[in-house]
UniProtKB/Swiss-Prot annotation:
Protein encoded by which gene: CCOAOMT
Binding-site residues for a divalent metal cation, renumbered to this chain: 158, 184-185
Enzyme class (EC, first level): transferase
Keyword Metal-binding carried by entry: yes
Record flagged with keyword Membrane: no
Residues where S-adenosyl-L-methionine binds: 58, 80, 82-83, 88, 106, 135, 160
Catalytic activity, as annotated: (E)-caffeoyl-CoA + S-adenosyl-L-methionine = (E)-feruloyl-CoA + S-adenosyl-L-homocysteine + H(+)
Protein name per the record: Caffeoyl-CoA O-methyltransferase
GO molecular function: caffeoyl-CoA O-methyltransferase activity; metal ion binding; S-adenosylmethionine-dependent methyltransferase activity
E.C. numbers: 2.1.1.104
Length: 242
């Protein structure tokens, strides 16, 4: 028979926290996250919770982490690949100075427009340049132009996991030396350590190998320093050093 601790662990892949205890995660949210969550972010989080694909959103604790991180590095020029309804985008916009900019790319404008009224009401829409469509062609054009090399303070990637390595090959040229790239979902619901016969959802099993490949590549990349954190579904921060 399982102990109380075992009963409290997340049994179903898809939970946004990697903590072993639901109660402990709820404690963090209720003690440190929700009481300090800006009203606009709370509103967008509650709107997104009604979306059938709400698990795609950035968790509230990760949003808080990103917001503080951006302030600590004094970010001004940023990029986000994978927007969904815009919760992490809103966290970023709130952290940037009034003349800060975010190039935001997603293949689905409809989801972005769910959160856009909240962003507009918060007076932050002027910071966002939203582009609908695949990000790779945009990145290739930016690299070809030449003027964008080393121009970004921070880049956040929360998109198609099978293209993470393709993004990295390009983003390393676009982020400045000393700047950060954040890759989301790098622990992928904990599946990175799941045994081969573990009962995983089809999409989790499919993308797991891409996440494993990314993690291995980042750890071996001499151009960056890395820090992998168990926040949300796992986020790996890469600081460009050369």
């Amino acid at each position: 028979m399982a102990s109380n601790g075992e009963n409290g662990r997340h049994q179903e892949v898809g939970h946004k926290s990697l903590l072993q205890s639901d109660a402990l995660y709820q404690y963090i949210l209720e003690t440190s996250v929700y009481p300090r969550e800006p009203e606009a972010m709370k509103e967008l989080r509650e709107i997104t919770a009604k979306h059938p694909w709400n698990l795609m959103t950035t968790s509230a604790d990760e949003g808080q982490f990103l917001n503080m991180l951006l302030k600590l590095i004094n970010a001004k020029n940023t990029m986000e690949i994978g927007v969904f309804t815009g919760y992490s985008l809103l966290a970023t916009a709130m952290a940037l100075p009034d003349d800060g900019k975010i190039l935001a790319m997603d293949i689905n404008r409809e989801n972005y427009e769910i959160g856009l009224p909240v962003i507009e009401k918060a007076g932050l829409a002027h910071k966002i340049d939203f582009r609908e469509g695949p990000a790779l062609p945009v990145l290739d054009q930016m690299i070809e132009d030449g003027k964008y090399h080393g121009s970004y303070d921070f880049i956040f990637v929360d998109a198609d996991k099978d293209n993470y390595l393709n993004y990295h090959k390009r983003l390393i040229d676009l982020v400045k030396v000393g700047g950060l790239i954040g890759y989301d979902n790098t622990l992928w619901n904990g599946s990175v350590v799941a045994p081969p016969d573990a009962p995983l959802r089809k999409y989790v099993r499919y993308y797991r190998d891409f996440v494993l490949e990314l993690n291995k590549a980042l750890a071996a990349d001499p151009r960056i320093e890395i820090c992998q954190l168990p926040v949300g579904d796992g986020i790996t921060l890469c600081r460009r050093i050369s």
